[in-house]
């Protein structure tokens, strides 16, 4: 076995040495014949007036990025070139049936096709792949390239936007009389191709759907030259996939905007209304900072999402102002603010019914009692005045000794009235007069007894008041003062509750107003985007074989 090993190694070595000699000698001979006297700098025409027809195609492999801020579209493409070179024609029978030959592209003439709207990087293809030579003289060269083309971004409907970008290719050196450009799928004299970009090897983007890829040929005349310069526009219409922005921007923004409505549902006594408003305002500001990092810095248009955020910030700002006004109404006191009759009529009687609010029965009872008390007070004052006049007339008409005795008693009681009147002055009774004025008491409450019993409403006391001793009359005045003070305090508390209820009605009123404004504003702004009503199906899922293999379900035959 060991003796047989060297002959086997020798045989293997001979086979390896014989393998290069087994290469296609016809292809080598063809390569030498075609390129031995070939000049790659000369345009491949037999006559100098002839035009080289270059057919151009674009095969999209991947949509790498669309930078909205820098307005740059980055794509991974294969740029297909096809033209005729009369020097590369041969008879396959003379070269062992060879019909195609792969040669390095650096060894042959290449059209200087560049990307006119280049934004960054190389204008031309930098990866020099091999070209395919056909025996008919046709040359096919399909190099890969990564282009960064400028794309004008329209941010009006962001994030429900559609963008149309283009890639303009043309010869940088030769005019239209030397090199004529046409699309590789162009037929007859039609300069437009509906599907101008090959999407068979396209990897679907996670952010954009491709709606259309038309191509169109143009001829442009420059001031320097009389000849036309042809170019081909490859247009790409993109529609944004909105799931990411809906979940991460739209939904939180809508939720925060509706929190501004709940500010008016929060009771004023909680003390957190202003804090909630400021927190919502700060959240809206944070969203503005996030969007400013995404959208391009342009003053030509305001993004749709920016409009909505601005709308919500206006609502939140108004809610802060209105909340301050509502709190001011809630904490008003009768000692500083007297409620106007129209306020009581509008905000306690009318608006609660329209706003579906239940008015407390105590407020309704207080309103009714105040109306009855007002009418009764006016009638009692009139009756008391009439009784006082009658008593004065009867006392003046009396001429009996008893009348004279009562007259002297009346003078004695009048002196006591003067003493009581002295108590009402600022120097008397430690400021009782000032306390009475604070709670709305009149001088009659401490003046003559007719006015005091006039408030009590008892007409019999008017006739018999002269029989009261001074101590009893003073006690009656003190009791009436305490009664008047307690009545004023009850009215003070009742009106304080009225201000609180008015603030509650204002909260409910603006709750409805802001709810309707938020709903209408949300739908009016966000539903403005035309992409929401566009039911055009993406063509990348239909034309891409890669997408069909990845996303379409397997079909068992």
From Swiss-Prot:
CDD domains xrefs: LGIC_ECD_nAChR_proto_alpha-like, LGIC_TM_nAChR
Topology Cytoplasmic: residue spans: 330-500
GO cellular component, one term: postsynaptic membrane
Cross-referenced PROSITE patterns: NEUROTR_ION_CHANNEL
Cysteines paired by S-S bonds: 151-165, 224-225
InterPro entries: Neur_chan_lig-bd, Neur_chan_lig-bd_sf, Neur_channel, Neuro-gated_channel_TM_sf, Neuro_actylchol_rec, Neurotrans-gated_channel_TM, Neurotransmitter_ion_chnl_CS, Nicotinic_acetylcholine_rcpt
Keyword Transmembrane: yes
Record's bilayer topology term: Multi-pass membrane protein
Pfam annotation, one family: Neur_chan_LBD
Transmembrane stretches, start-end: 245-266, 274-294, 308-329, 501-523
Residues that carry a glycan: 47, 235
GO molecular function: acetylcholine-gated monoatomic cation-selective channel activity; transmembrane signaling receptor activity
Keywords, in A-Z order: Cell membrane, Disulfide bond, Glycoprotein, Ion channel, Ion transport, Ligand-gated ion channel, Membrane, Postsynaptic cell membrane, Receptor, Signal, Synapse, Transmembrane, Transmembrane helix, Transport
Extracellular compartment segments: 24-244
Subcellular location field: Postsynaptic cell membrane; Cell membrane
Signal peptide (from-to): 1-23
PANTHER family for the chain: NEUROTRANSMITTER GATED ION CHANNEL
The protein's role, per its UniProt record: After binding acetylcholine, the AChR responds by an extensive change in conformation that affects all subunits and leads to opening of an ion-conducting channel across the plasma membrane.
Family: Belongs to the ligand-gated ion channel (TC 1.A.9) family. Acetylcholine receptor (TC 1.A.9.1) subfamily.
Protein's recorded name: Acetylcholine receptor subunit alpha-L1
Lineage: Eukaryota, Metazoa, Ecdysozoa, Arthropoda, Hexapoda
